[in-house]
Amino acid sequence: MDEDGEKHVLTKRSSFPESSDKNSGDEGDWVRRDLPESLLFQVLLNIPTKDLVKTSVVSPEWRHLWRCVPGLDLDEADFTQFDTLVSFIDSFLSINRESSLNKFKLRIYCNHDRDKETNNAHMARWISAIVEQNVQHVDLTWLPVEVPPILYLCESLVTLRLCGVVLANLEFMYLPLVKVLALEWVIFANELALEKLISGCLVLESLRFCKCSLDNVNVLRVRSQSLLSFNYYGPSSRDLHFKDLAVTIDAPKLEILKLSHQVTSSFIIKKLSSLVEANIKVEFNFCVGKKFNPNDLSKRKMILHFLVAISRVKNMTIAASTLEIIYDYSRCEPVPLFRNISLLRVEFYQDRWEISPFFLESCPNVKSLVVESDYYTKKRTSILSRPRRLLSSLEYVKIKSSWDKLEMKLVSYFIENSPVLKKVTLCLDGCSRKESVVLRELLTIPRRSSSCQVVVL
């Protein structure tokens, strides 16, 4: 122990082939580093346990160091037999039963021939042990094993990630310190079980939810006064097992919203006054052989309220499939204005460029626009006619695409209708046309902004 009361550890000089210290001895000597034990363990916590075990050959002083690291990060694939994994975990938890545990991360993807009762018994034993050790971070992937109730009453837990496990309908869940909650392919007893889990996280700041067809959740209700970030996503394969899915969000402090699930029918969101960033890829279930119906007033009302709820966002990424539905909606009634948007990113997976200019008219203060597409087709669609108003705030445009004549029409649209445009960046990756031809066409476009610079990459 030194003057600060911190233990120091010995590390081998492996980074330097030679030492400038004449008294340091040979290259293979051990050198005492001024690295406190607490800081060393903090670094080692970020290394998988299988790699930590390898450090035991570094020196005699490191032989048992990995046993003292307050965390486990294990993958079943690193063990030739499941029983060996079980023994390893049991041994580690037993050795450290009097110490606090920072992290418990376990990935088991297949049950093989093991019976359900045995798996649940292992899970119950380990969860009970880590809760007693005041674990702070839990990351469990085990298909499909039931997590014991004691985990949902862990008052030391800060982050919780569950994947593929089963969650029973408990009467009470209390996780007073959990700030990060990630639920992927989790099977819930019912919707109420999920609601209790979310509401039981009293200081929740980040929620990630991956939808699966067997999770028993048709209506996802997110109510949190502390939530800052919400990410909702699911498979894009148009799974026909999904029926009448809905998401309701009541999170007044939400700053980041990511929605990516085409077959969810309804999103009911209370106005998000603090929203900074949104990534929207939803189709309101119009993707499964359904089309927007102007006579469906309830659907139109839902879309309107959805747009109003996110209209205060500052930076938005939006999919072309979502824009297409908004475009269809706009034929029935006006689209709300997105006055706060400064950066707009549009991701095209279909050749529907004409819907981009229409939405820009609803973003009167947008300064930067990024248009991306990795889709190429010989099909041609027409850009909308000249805008009802100029793009008076647009300063920067970047277009990344396979590039053809249609993109040139889009570039012309921006250059001709943006009076304060400063820079247009064109990425010609995968372009079948000669760069010289593209450059000649660019020179013929009349520029409304005299200071506009066009850069071709």
From Swiss-Prot:
InterPro entries documented for this protein: F-box-like_dom_sf, F-box_AtFBL13-like, F-box_dom, FBD, FBL13/AtMIF1-like, LRR_dom_sf, LRR_PRU1-like
Q: Write out the biased-composition intervals (Basic and acidic residues).
A: 19-29
Spell out the Pfam families in the cross-references. Answer: F-box, FBD, LRR_2
UniProt cross-references to SMART domains, sorted A to Z: FBD, FBOX
Give every F-box domain span.
29-75
In this protein, which residues make up the domain named FBD?
Answer: 378-428
Q: Where is this region: Disordered?
A: 1-29
SUPFAM superfamilies listed in its UniProt record: F-box domain, RNI-like
Which superkingdom? Eukaryota
What protein does this entry describe?
FBD-associated F-box protein At1g66320
Please name the source species.
Answer: Arabidopsis thaliana (Mouse-ear cress)
